[in-house]
Amino acid sequence: MSIAARLIKSLPAAGLMLACAAACAPRAHAEVSVFKIDIGLPNTVAVMVRGDFSGNEILRFKSAIAEIDPGKRIIAILDSPGGDVVQGEALGRFFWDARIPTMVLGGTLCASACTYAFLGGRNPTTGNPLRILALGAKLGFHRFRPDGMPERAYTKAELENVSRETQQIVYRNLQHLIYVHASLDVLKLNTGTVNEQVNFITEGDALNYGIAVLDAQTGNLVLPDNIDQRTRKGDQ
């Protein structure tokens, strides 16, 4: 049985324990805490990142896992409304490089910059993408705009500068998605919104973006692979 299958088989109880632990974690900023929970995989440790990304979450995460036996696998549990995009990207790339799966538990949130981290999840055995969204979890995207943009009339030169900055943001987003092998369709979720609004996707939609969906009550994990193959065949 694969690491993913064994993990999911044990998640009904593990998810409840993680949820209880999460309820006690501080929300002031993204505090990295290590939850050593028995989920049927004695060589696996769950690490939670919770709260706003304030600027050094990647350091906190690396500091946390530095204390964990290198022989143990790690699962990143995310619960954040967003914050510093640079930190989200850094976490996502590290998750991908270190083959760390990501998960958002039911009743919790991963939005804005947090999605950059979430999309870096990777199967430690196969090396394929592994991002898990539990039923009842919220995953949200929105468009980022250049800083310092008050509502006022702008000159042509200013608008051209804003256009260049926006293109750079989109390009940077694209490069991140390519790095972590995420669906490029995610760009539509970002560019199709205004920066003040968050576009939350359903569990069914998540499968279209290469995200696995977990029913923690039954332990059933719906993988996007076969659905993606059927969709591709339909496009041919």
Descriptions of predicted regions:
Residues V85-G92, W96:
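Membrane-embedded segments
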Residues V49, A76, F118, A206:
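Terminal peptide-recognition signature
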Residues L18-R27:
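C-terminal segment of classical bacterial N-terminal signal peptides
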Residues S2-G15:
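Bacterial N-terminal signal peptides that target proteins for export
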Residues A28-R73, D79-G83, G127-D185:
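Small-residue-centered hinge/linker elements
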Residues G71-Q87, P101-L109:
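Short, glycine-/small-residue-enriched flexible loop/hinge segments at domain edges that mediate gating
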Residues W96-P146:
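Glycine-rich beta-to-alpha active-site loop
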Residues H142-D235:
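Charged, glycine-interspersed solvent-exposed loop segments at helix/strand-loop junctions
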